[in-house]
Amino acid sequence: LVSESNPGRAIPAGGKGATIRAARPGLATTLNGPKAGNGTTGATKLTTPARPLSEGANMMCDHRAGGNAAISGSSVGEGTARAGDSKVMSRMLSPKGSIIAGTVNMMPADIAAGSVRTPSSLPPDGRSATPMSVSEVASDISHKDGSVNVTKDPVTAAGLTAMRKNANKGSPPASPLPLKADNKGVHINKHWVDLKNDNDFNTR
């Protein structure tokens, strides 16, 4: 992982308000934001060199003070950003220019060829400045390999648990609720969401 402002140089621990553990694809890379209450924003920008999807997707992450987000690259190029109990919001920006806000789990084949850039522009309360509907998210993910998780609740552990239980009518699964997106709509488990009628699934 390298600093966008200083290409080719690894970001040291504590750089730009984040502690970074670089890892090869398949291992987790963890970012810890500045301590809560210090009034600063953890705006560490990360990018990896362009690699095939099998070696991990390229992405960057902005996160708020007091929060943390984990990004892991698996052997199939999956990138996961997951918020904890603090109301941290991870934001990812695809090459197409649309912001994906919320808890996102993506396998973006169309992103593998280049870096994903994210602006450092979260409002003071940590909410997303630009909410996205499921249709907007779906249209931004490869319809062949795209997989994205979106929660309509504020990004908290309780909100995610409630959504998983509601969607699965039982205990929450080990991983976030899967949404399969293609160029016609979004599959939520076995349920279909029409891209033109998805207001109940907007991210916040």
UniProtKB/Swiss-Prot annotation:
Q: Characterize the regulation of its activity.
A: Activity is stimulated by zinc, potassium, lithium, cobalt, sodium, calcium, iron, manganase, magnesium and mercury ions at a concentration of 1 mM, but inhibited by copper ions at a concentration of 1 mM. Activity is inhibited by potassium, sodium and magnesium ions at a concentration of 1 M. Activity is inhibited by urea, EDTA, dithiothreitol, p-CMB, PSF, natrium lauryl sulfate and N-bromosuccinimide.
Q: Per the UniProt entry, how does temperature affect activity?
A: Optimum temperature is 70 degrees Celsius. Active from 50 to 80 degrees Celsius, at 55 degrees Celsius it has 50% of its full activity. Thermostable, retains full activity after heating at 60 degrees Celsius for 24 hours. In the absence of substrate, its half life at 70 degrees Celsius is 50 minutes. In the presence of substrate full activity is retained after incubation at 70 degrees Celsius for 2.5 hours.
What highest taxon heads this organism's lineage? Bacteria
Q: What is its EC number?
A: 4.2.2.25
One GO molecular function term of this record is: gellan lyase activity
Question: What subcellular locations does the record give?
Answer: Secreted
Reactions catalysed, as given in the entry? Eliminative cleavage of beta-D-glucopyranosyl-(1->4)-beta-D-glucopyranosyluronate bonds of gellan backbone releasing tetrasaccharides containing a 4-deoxy-4,5-unsaturated D-glucopyranosyluronic acid at the non-reducing end. The tetrasaccharide produced from deacetylated gellan is beta-D-4-deoxy-Delta(4)-GlcAp-(1->4)-beta-D-Glcp-(1->4)-alpha-L-Rhap-(1->3)-beta-D-Glcp
EC top class named in words:
lyase
Q: Report the protein name in the record.
A: Gellan lyase
